[in-house]
A protein has these predicted regions:
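Extracellular/virion structural assembly segments
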Residues: 2-152
Length: 152
């Protein structure tokens, strides 16, 4: 991630954030700010059944009978896990939907776990040291690399 041309308070906030992470010791939640839902969505999506694993997630609570409820390339999040929808998905007349996802489910979600699809976020950690460049105390640019914490 790049944060360019930060000055004053923004620069100090970023430096404090990075110091607080203490390398890979602490985690942070992040979303893709360029992401927009391309499917129709609607309703309060919840896990339907607490014994799920693999690359499909069965849910209920969707708005009924929506073609392209979620589309390939959309994201969902549950249990602090971020997943990409890999196939277009329709909801049925009862508001049920089966979502094909990648990567596979890592921790079996409990029944009725909320599935976030409008602003999905994942838990990340730094992949290595952060770096920044300051231009004569006017602005700073930061570069950080992060990986999803698959054990969160």
């Amino acid at each position: 991630m790049q944060f360019a041309n930060l000055s004053g308070a923004d620069r100090k906030t970023m430096q404090a954030f990075l110091a607080k992470l203490n390398g890979q010791q602490h985690r942070f939640t992040v979303q893709d700010h360029s992401y927009t839902l391309s499917g129709g969505g609607g309703g309060t999506l919840q896990v339907n059944g607490g014994t799920q694993s693999g690359t499909s997630l069965v849910c209920d609570g969707a708005t009924a009978s929506v073609t392209n409820y979620l589309k390939a390339g959309d994201y969902i999040a549950f249990n602090n896990e971020l997943h990409m929808v890999v196939a277009d998905t329709n909801s049925d007349a009862s508001g049920n939907v089966t979502i094909s996802i990648a990567p596979p489910i890592r921790k079996t979600p409990a029944d009725d776990t909320i599935v976030e699809y409008t602003v999905p976020k994942g838990v990340f950690m730094l992949a290595g040291p952060a770096s920044w460049d300051t231009q004569t105390d006017i602005t700073s640019s930061f570069n950080i690399e992060a990986v999803e914490d698959v054990l969160a």
